[in-house]
Swiss-Prot record:
Pfam families: TAXi_C, TAXi_N
Biological role: Seed storage protein. Has a protein kinase activity. Binds leginsulin.
SUPFAM superfamilies noted in UniProt: Acid proteases (SSF50630)
Upper classification of the organism: Eukaryota, Viridiplantae, Streptophyta, Embryophyta, Tracheophyta
CDD domains named among the record's database cross-references: xylanase_inhibitor_I_like
UniProt family annotation: Belongs to the peptidase A1 family.
InterPro entries: Aspartic_peptidase_A1, PEPTIDASE_A1, Peptidase_aspartic_dom_sf, TAXi_C, TAXi_N, Xylanase_inhibitor_I-like
Keyword set includes Disulfide bond: yes
Assembly mode: The mature protein consists of high- and low-kDa subunits linked by disulfide bonds.
Annotated signal peptide: 1-24
Protein name: Basic 7S globulin
Length: 427
């Protein structure tokens, strides 16, 4: 009798697996790149994506967090999948996720609630709330592409993608509406880039091209995009990449170093002259983040920055500031805003240019504000480059060689938007 039950159980699992395979295909060529379409949330300025997960596959909307350690989703409501598993405590999967905490849930078994599993701490990057959840594994599917075409390829799968089933309170504040979790792109072992690179044999590298416009999509491209997507509409959109060293903080955050700031070629000051009050910070430490929409500056940097910026524009154009911004203008009295140059790494290092358009925010009809925030005396970094500074720009995170590449000219100068890179119609 036991052998008969075992036979029917095996047959059932095989049928489930075959049903799952019908939603995806096995590629006939080596996979060079995989692509995650990403959207701009108009109400928050943050970016989110629909991940294809579970069996049968369904779309799960998640916030994109550049510095997140792993993927976490809310499993407490309507998580249904034929392929979900919870690895046992002290298993290989738990070691890979760098967690040695055992967790047992006394309620009936369901995704996120099992006995003798691994506990994994997840963080809402907007509210900084944390919550302990169950380490789980389930199917994840993502679009493959060869890079030589704008068409998104078929869905390819990671059958046992590791993630956290986080408590539901983590999604209740701060995230874009209807999102059910966070996709971490950080440096941790089970982050999205590291698991995809390991499973598909990709280079440990990903490129962001975030759309500025809520009505169109951008993309995160995993793999060596600069060498596989060079020819786009008969032009090399990666030809002007400049690179700067990438460091990882103790918290696992992506950091680069800014040596100095210039506004319309007027020097703000070299950052190594700042007496930093940030614990554990090195002078010029700059975090790159998608969990804040705007640039954030340590207070002394902010004060000098806004002073020099205001000096480049007619004083009579200034108007009363609109919270949360500190410097605002009558947009009808200004034709163009000054550009900002971040001199990277060393005095003669490459220049990351941010156009005036990329810094300004329309706060009210006829009122435009400098989208730079005062981070106080002890922010997480002296400078934080927010999502808006990454938009409509190719930014390459080369984890294998510990460097970040950025375009020294905007995509707009090529007549291209992030939405043009792929045909997102069916994504």
């Amino acid at each position: 009798m036991a052998s008969i039950l075992h036979y029917f159980l095996a047959l059932s699992l095989s049928c489930s697996f075959l049903f799952f395979l019908s939603d995806s295909v096995t590629p006939t060529k080596p996979i060079n790149l995989v692509v995650l379409p990403v959207q701009n949330d108009g109400s928050t300025g943050l970016h989110w994506a629909n991940l294809q997960k579970r069996t049968p596959l369904m779309q799960v909307p998640v916030l994109v967090d550049l510095n997140g350690n792993h993927l976490w989703v809310n499993c407490e409501q309507q998580y249904s999948s034929k392929t979900y598993q919870a690895p046992f405590c002290h298993s290989t999967q738990c070691s890979r996720a760098n967690t040695h905490q055992c967790l047992s849930c006394p309620a009936a078994s369901r995704p996120g609630c099992h006995k003798n599993t691994c506990g994994l701490m997840s963080t809402n990057p907007i509210t900084q709330q944390t919550g302990l959840g169950e380490l789980g594994e389930d199917v994840l599917a993502i679009h493959a592409t060869q890079g030589s075409t704008q068409q998104l390829g078929p869905l390819v799968t990671v059958p046992q993608f590791l993630f956290s089933c986080a408590p539901s309170f983590l999604v209740q504040k701060g995230l874009p509406r209807n999102t059910q979790g966070v996709a971490g792109l950080g440096h941790a072992p089970i982050s999205l880039p590291n698991q995809l690179a390991s499973h598909f044999g990709l280079q440990r590298q990903f490129t962001t091209c975030l759309s500025r416009y809520p009505t169109s999509k951008g993309a995160i491209i995993f793999g060596d995009a600069p060498n596989n997507m060079r020819q786009f509409q008969n032009q090399d959109i990666f030809h002007d990449l400049a690179f700067t060293p990438l460091t990882i903080t103790l918290q696992g955050e992506y950091n680069v170093r800014v040596n100095s700031i210039r506004i319309n070629q007027h020097s703000v000051f070299p950052l190594n002259k700042i007496s930093s009050t940030i614990v554990g910070s090195t002078s010029g430490g700059t975090m790159i983040s998608t969990s804040t929409p705007h640039m954030v500056l340590q207070q002394s940097v902010y004060q000098a920055f806004t002073q020099v910026f205001a000096q480049q524009l007619p004083k009579q154009a200034q108007v009363k500031s609109v919270a949360p911004f500190g410097l605002c203008f009558n947009s009808n009295k200004i034709n163009a805003y000054p550009s900002v140059d971040l001199v990277m790494d060393k005095p003669n290092g490459p220049v990351w240019r941010i156009s005036g358009e990329d810094l300004m925010v329309q706060a009210q009809p006829g009122v435009t504000c400098l989208g730079v925030m005062n981070g106080g005396m002890q922010p997480r970094a002296e400078i934080t480059l927010g999502a808006r500074q990454l938009e409509e720009n190719l930014v390459v995170f080369d984890l294998a060689r510990s460097r970040v590449g950025f375009s020294t000219s905007s995509l707009h100068s090529h007549g291209v938007k992030c939405a043009d890179l792929f045909n997102f119609a069916n994504a």
